[in-house]
Each structure stands twice: as C-alpha cells, then as structure tokens.
Design a protein with these regions (language model features):
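Short leucine-rich amphipathic alpha-helical surface patches
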Residues: 118-120, 142, 161
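Short, compositionally biased strand/turn segments
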Residues: 1, 10, 14-18, 109-121
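Residues within well-ordered beta-strands of beta-sheet-rich folds
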Residues: 76-78, 115-117, 156-158
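Solvent-exposed edge beta-strands and adjacent loop segments
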Residues: 2-83, 131-151
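Short solvent-exposed strand/turn elements
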Residues: 151-166
Length: 167
C-alpha cells in the first residue's frame, strides 16, 4: 500500500485526565496551532584499536562502534490563550472537551503526571489509527501577549518512562 500523508489539521496532542495512559478520559490540548513529538536515543560509543594484516597495531587509529543507550521523548504545542475559560477543569459539570491554557497551567503548577497521546484526532474518537502514548509532566509553559495580536502559549510535556506505539 502506498504511503498517504496525514493532514496536520487532523493530528493533535491529547491528555488523559486520570494521570495514566489508559485512554479513558482524553481531552485535546485546546486551541493549538501546532504540535510536535520528539524522540531521542542517547548513543554510546566504543573505540577499538585496529590490527594490521600482519598482526601489528595499526598506526592510523581504530574503529568507533555506536549503539542506542537510554531514550527520552517530549511533546510540545503552541496555541491561543483563552483566559475567560474558567470551566476547563477536570471533571467539572461544564468541563470542555479540551485542556485550555488555564488547565495546562494548573497541571504545571501542581506537577501533575498525565497520560499523553500524539495521534490523529479521529483516533481519539475510537478509530484505530497509529499514534504514540506515554506518561509525562509539563516541563514548561509560557504565555505571551503582543500589541494587536492574539495571546499565545507554548507548552512542553517531558516524557516519564517509555513511549509506546498505538497500533
């Protein structure tokens, strides 16, 4: 089957309210204008001395071998701020289906560990599309408001443990 590009409009970061990656209470990171997923492998290198064909030590150095060590991941989003939204709290009677800036800031201040998902928005509604999930904390959140511009925010989730594939 040929590869088909996914529209960036369909991909989002979703947060699981029950602080674990169970997928029971997914809410979109709200008013986002962009999002990204980053995965890193630390590399471990070993250097060995080379031997010439005659069994003597080579004078031109050796060989460097590398392998993957520890891994880490993070997710980030940029979005628009809605400071008037007081009811984007977890479990509130009028809670929205999104985590707005207020709620993200509350999670950052509390150091809340959350389940985090990077996937097609239709997958959060039950369609089986590939994505990625893990647990994370909000590492940083920043808001800015310029003259004659919309107030914006940037949030970064730092992974805690392994990142898993959603099949």
């Amino acid at each position: 089957m040929a590869l088909v590009p996914t529209s960036g409009n369909k991909v989002g970061i979703f947060v699981d309210n029950d602080n674990a990656a169970s997928g029971d209470a997914l809410r979109l990171v709200g008013l986002a204008t962009s999002c990204s997923l980053s995965y890193n492998n630390a590399t471990v290198e070993t250097a060995t001395k080379s031997v010439n064909g005659g069994g003597t030590l080579a004078t031109n150095g050796g060989t460097i071998n590398s392998f993957a060590g520890t891994s880490s991941f993070s997710l980030s989003a940029d979005g628009l701020v809605d400071l008037s939204t007081a009811d984007d709290e977890d479990g509130g009677a009028s809670a929205t289906t999104e985590h707005g800036f207020n709620n993200l800031m509350d999670m950052a201040i509390a150091g809340t560990k959350v389940g985090i998902y990077f996937q097609d928005a239709t997958a959060a509604g039950g369609t089986a599309n590939k994505g990625y999930t893990g647990t994370a904390f909000i590492e940083s959140i920043e808001a800015s408001a310029g003259v004659d511009d919309f107030a914006t925010y940037s949030v970064t989730f730092k992974g805690d443990g392994a990142l898993s594939v959603i099949a």
